[in-house]
Amino acid sequence: MYIALLGRQPEISLAELAAVFGVDNVNRISQQFAKVQTDQFDITTLGGTIKCAKVITEFPASRTDKASLLAASRFITQHYQAKWAHSPHKITLGLSAYDLTVSARDVQKTGLILKSSLKKSGTSLRLIPNDQPALSTATAHNNKLGNSPHKVELLLIKTTDRRLIIAESRGVQNITAYTRRDRHRPKRDAFVGMLPPKLAQIMLNLALGAGSLTGQKSCGNSVTRSASSLSDKSMVLRTALPDAFDLEEMAGSRPVVTILDPFCGTGTVLQEALLAGYDVVGTDLSQKMVDYTAENLSWLQSTFTTPGRPVGRVIDIHQADATTHRWPNSTHLAAVVCETYLGQPFSAPPTPQKLAEVVGNCNHIITGFLTNIRPQLAPNTPLCIAVPAWYDASGQATHLPLIKNLQKLGYYQLNRTPLIYRRPDQIVARELLVLKSIGKTVPQA
């Protein structure tokens, strides 16, 4: 059993966990956390999880948060005194408390008590200082907490049903790696938008685990589904892949999984797909973007390929209009993942007339794309596409009209709740649509 610290957009983080592990195995336990029933949890494959930790114990919370912390402190001291006594390794320890009204000093006391106790048995412990009750992502990452049995972060979480969970970190979001894959690429273009690599990673997981989102509904703080468990990648692929796709087709010993991005821009979706081991096809209306993508993917392959970690293959990158193009072998695509045309950027809410113009333009282009590609896809091909949504000063959103007509366009929408990726005060947000193609494939002439 694991717990996951959700990202800034918790609904998106939850949807990703549901797609990867299966909704029956994901339960929201607080505003910030979900519990995940699984034996394995690799945080590097998830863009929406900030920290993950293995549950060590849980018990009813006390009447006050300070009493709960005291009970947790007793357990931690007893459990880890026995575990680490006479350890030949120096222990690095961090402590984080969530949803407990306690001070950083109160949390630190638990570590100091354990440090003193271990010193008597000859074990050296370095305690990471707290300036807040919970350690930041950067602090946990920079101290490599969760990366080895000797570098540990203990998470104390009070749940909404008043239980106290003590969990041992198994990793934190690698902010250094994301920065390298984003800002260190040879080609970037702020004008066309810069899709964060972790959002691209989320979108790939949503698409390839799309089958697990079917029938998703809210049930208190939990997320439920009727499909089978998707706790490993092969099961995710078997649930999500289109009818015409043959998972047994192999390249060496690796299943052939091909991702298409018809709006590839600078190649962020494709690079994350390559790192996950998938083959990629990319197109863009702009030859400049095609050139940028090709250079970025070449950099990625030369930078990140190692003997123990091969990346996927670049099958084709070329210039094409997504509203009219015919993609070769499109019935064999595993998924379509893309950030579509987001329209004009705004630093302040536009006038109603300007907004109507931009909405109409984006709606026309994206409708044209969905109409064009649908008959080229095998039935049940999953898509995860980012489309624009516009927010006014009061926080009210304007959505694309096409969202209400997806079935007429030949798609089922699998996410039942809106998945909005947006910074505070951002005018143009990204709305994620998780879709499945319906209808028959039209043979190419």
Where are these regions (language model features)?
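Class I S-adenosyl-L-methionine-dependent methyltransferase catalytic core
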Residues: M1-V55, R63-A71, D99-I113, T137-E153, ...
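Extended, charged/glycine-rich binding lobes that contact polyanionic ligands
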Residues: T110-D131
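Short, charged beta->alpha transition segments
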Residues: K66-H86
